[in-house]
Structure formats: structure tokens, C-alpha cells
From Swiss-Prot:
Binds 1 zinc ion per subunit. The keyword Zinc applies. Its EC number is 6.3.4.20. It comes from the Bacteria. Catalyzes the ATP-dependent conversion of 7-carboxy-7-deazaguanine (CDG) to 7-cyano-7-deazaguanine (preQ(0)). Pfam families: QueC. InterPro entries: QueC (IPR018317), Rossmann-like_a/b/a_fold (IPR014729). It catalyses: 7-carboxy-7-deazaguanine + NH4(+) + ATP = 7-cyano-7-deazaguanine + ADP + phosphate + H2O + H(+). Zn(2+) binds at residues 187, 197, 200, 203. The gene is queC. ATP binds at residues 8-18. Gene3D superfamilies: HUPs (3.40.50.620). Pathway: Purine metabolism; 7-cyano-7-deazaguanine biosynthesis. This is 7-cyano-7-deazaguanine synthase.
Amino acid sequence: MKKAVVLLSGGLDSATCLAIARDQGYACHTIAFDYGQRTRSELDAAERVSGVLGALSHRVIELGMGNIGGSALTDHSIEVPENGGDGIPVTYVPARNTVFLSLALGLAEVIDAQAIFIGVNAVDYSGYPDCRPAFIEAFQSMATLATKAGVEGRPMQIETPLMHLSKAQIIQRGVALGLDYGLTVSCYQADDHGNACGKCDSCRLRSQGFEDALVKDPTNYQ
């Protein structure tokens, strides 16, 4: 059976990615990152989603990105904004997806996976530069050059099935695949029980997505 590594944050998008990868016939191995983020409950959500959707393995990789700072998600001295603004927001974590994908690439090579799934999106998103198609295309080129599998003509494919979908379309796709979004945590500052603030940009996008999809929002709010 073909294998895939799925980056799993515990949020709505990455959970949908896992459901899609499974539906496409991949034996899935999930990977989450403890990078010093505010929302610790998202790691619990990632483990929960991985188990319910039948991933063959789940790994949590510890990273010290909080030591770098520069983001409201890793530096508690920077407040999480309640409204989206112009430009790249302070919730952007410098180089996060580059680091995450690099580690997922290493795992994929070790387990001989054919694909890496990541839930980046360029429609209903916060404007992060490492969620754009151009970034994924560049990383794909790098991955082909930088790995034994790529050099030997077996490059791993970076799969981004959500890239051009609206949040409502993502939710509808997940619901069609039987995904329970009550398992997920998307909030930038959820409490230890996964209850969402209802005010941050991630909460706004999630809530609007359920409304537009005509699907009941299962999110628990503080």
C-alpha cells in the first residue's frame, strides 16, 4: 500500500487533509510539532484526530521555535489580534512551514512514503507567505534535489488538496468523508480543554466557514 506523511496540527484543515489522504488509499503516518505554541490543546486534538482516522503512527516532534520568537503564537509578549488586518499578521511564525515540511520530508524518506500532505490554503487564509502555491512549488523542487529518493528518480510529492478551496468547501469535503470537526482545535489561543476564544482570525475563518457551508459549528467557545 502506498504511504503518506500527513502534517497534523489538530486543526480543521489538517484533519481534512488526513481524511482526504486516507480516502485516496494512503496508509497514513501523522506528524505534529510542539514548537512552543500558545495552544497546547491542539496537540491533544492532533493525537485524537490521528487515532480516530486510523493513522498507522503519530509522532510529536519537539522544536524550540519559541526561542526565536517573533510571533504572537510563540511569544506571549505579543498579543494575538482580534481582527484580521492588512499585510502579514503577527501570528505568522517565521519559517514554520519550511521547518515542518523539512522534518516531514525526512520522515517520509525514512519510511519510504510516496507523498506528504499539508493543509495549506491560499483562499480563506491569514496571508502567510509559506501557504502560497509558489512556496510549495519551490519546496517540491528542493525536496527532489535534496533527497536520496529524489536523486534516484522517486521524488516524494507534496500534496496540497486544500490549496484552492474556500473554508466552506473544505468543511463540506470533510463532512462528506465523515470527519467529525468536533475533534479539532483551530483557535490561536484555545484553553487547555480546547475551548476557542471566538475572536482571533482563525476562529473567525472557521466560524464563517461553517456558516457558509450550512453546517452546524461544533466548536466549543470560552
